């Protein structure tokens, strides 16, 4: 039923659990899996830091994102899943918009995402990025709540 499953991850426990579920579903449907990590515009949180430090921080965020993707892709591949991974840098667009654009571009027929990520104040039931993705997506979205 699902040929291409798109799973964004952010390094949180919720996204790790989400990846586990995406792997299970991909195995059951013999689907391909795209794992995506976003390095986003974090400048509002860095008020007062020197510009020289920003380049180092960006470099470290990319490096950490690449490590996260490599580990996630190895995890999925070890389960026999055909896996692709992608690191995307977001500077001006909203994360849900970028997620949907990337899922569309790849031809995903299911998006699997955690209910809450690493940043921001949690809304009542869903994280803001997940909630907004659900609102704008033409692709079915399966939300995974963190196992507690």
Range-by-range predicted roles:
Residues 37, 87-89, 145:
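Residue-level recognition of beta-strand->loop/alpha-helix junctions
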Residues 18, 45-47, 96-98, 123-125:
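Short, well-ordered secondary-structure micro-motifs
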Residues 74-111:
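Structural beta-alpha unit
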Residues 31-32, 81, 108, 139:
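Short glycine/serine/threonine/alanine-rich loop segments
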Residues 22, 72, 99, 133:
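Aromatic/hydrophobic pocket-lining residues that form π-stacking "cages" and hydrophobic walls in ligand
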Residues 53-67:
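A short acidic, glycine-rich active-site loop
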Residues 3-52, 75-77, 84:
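Small/aliphatic-rich secondary-structure junction motif
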Residues 24, 104-148:
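Gly/Ser-rich helix-loop-strand patches that form or flank binding pockets
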């Amino acid at each position: 039923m699902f040929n291409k499953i798109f799973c964004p991850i952010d390094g949180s426990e919720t996204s790790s659990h989400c990846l586990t579920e995406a792997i299970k579903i991909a195995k059951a449907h013999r689907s391909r899996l795209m794992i995506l990590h976003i390095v986003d515009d974090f400048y509002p949180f860095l008020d007062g830091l020197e510009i020289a430090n920003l380049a180092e921080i960006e470099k470290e965020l990319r490096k950490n994102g690449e490590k996260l993707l490599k580990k996630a892709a190895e995890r999925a591949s070890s389960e026999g899943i055909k896996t692709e991974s992608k690191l995307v840098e977001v500077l001006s667009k909203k994360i849900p918009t970028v997620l949907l654009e990337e899922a569309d571009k790849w031809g995903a027929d299911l998006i699997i995402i955690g209910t809450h990520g690493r940043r921001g104040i949690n809304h009542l039931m869903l994280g803001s990025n997940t909630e907004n993705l659900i609102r704008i997506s033409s692709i079915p979205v399966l939300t995974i709540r963190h196992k507690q």
